[in-house]
Design a protein with these regions (language model features):
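A short beta-loop-alpha structural element at the N-terminal edge
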Residues: 2-18
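Conserved acetyl-CoA-binding loop of GNAT-fold acetyltransferases
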Residues: 123-133
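Conserved acetyl-CoA-binding loop-helix of GNAT-fold acetyltransferases
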Residues: 78, 84-98, 120-124
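Terminal substrate-recognition subdomain of acyl/acetyltransferases
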Residues: 141-153
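Hydrophobic adenine-recognition pocket in adenosine-nucleotide-binding enzymes
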Residues: 8, 78, 111
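Acetyl-CoA-dependent GNAT
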Residues: 24-83, 98, 152
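Conserved beta-strand-loop-alpha-helix junction that forms the acyl-donor binding cleft
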Residues: 109-119, 135-142
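Conserved GNAT acetyl-CoA-binding A-motif
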Residues: 99-110
């Protein structure tokens, strides 16, 4: 296993949409995204997203947002064929190293309470719960809890 992360580029968007839509029931926004809409969004916003690779094969991606002087929000999705193998944990360690080089000292994330696998991973990675709020998952009528977490790098 050799996990690397790199800047996500336009050629990665088809993969991103496939993985994101497959994982959408675990996300705060469960709306299905189109490739065309994703391309427009990517060109318009130039997001700081990262492709996750294992031995040169794309297996998932990280998204970052709300960058401040020394903090940002993070989240990630892994292709279903690569889950349950410890790859996301290793990928987060790579992401943390990259963020440290960018002078990020604090990372935040938000996870839906029913996503127990992700919540437990975040606890093992050293994230602490900041708050829990009631939310309606976009694209559904589902009411659930959103857990905001923080980690010092």
């Amino acid at each position: 296993m050799t996990i690397t992360i790199r800047n996500l580029v336009e050629n990665d968007l088809e993969f991103l949409v496939e993985v994101r839509n497959e994982c959408r029931h675990f996300l705060h926004n469960a709306t299905e995204f189109s490739l065309e809409g994703c391309r427009d969004w990517f060109k318009r916003t130039n997001p700081r997203f990262y492709a996750i690779e294992n031995n040169g094969i794309r297996i998932g991606y990280f998204r970052t947002s709300e960058w401040q002087q020394d903090s940002c929000w993070v989240g990630g999705d892994l292709h279903r064929n690569y889950r349950g193998k410890g790859l996301m944990k290793a990928a987060y360690f790579e992401l943390f190293e990259k963020l440290k080089k960018l002078n990020v000292k604090t990372v935040f994330l938000s996870v839906l309470s029913f996503n127990e696998v992700a919540f437990n991973l975040y606890k093992r990675l050293g994230f602490q719960t900041l708050s829990i709020t009631d939310v309606q998952q976009s694209g559904t009528n589902k009411l659930t809890n959103s857990i905001q977490m923080v980690k010092e790098l």
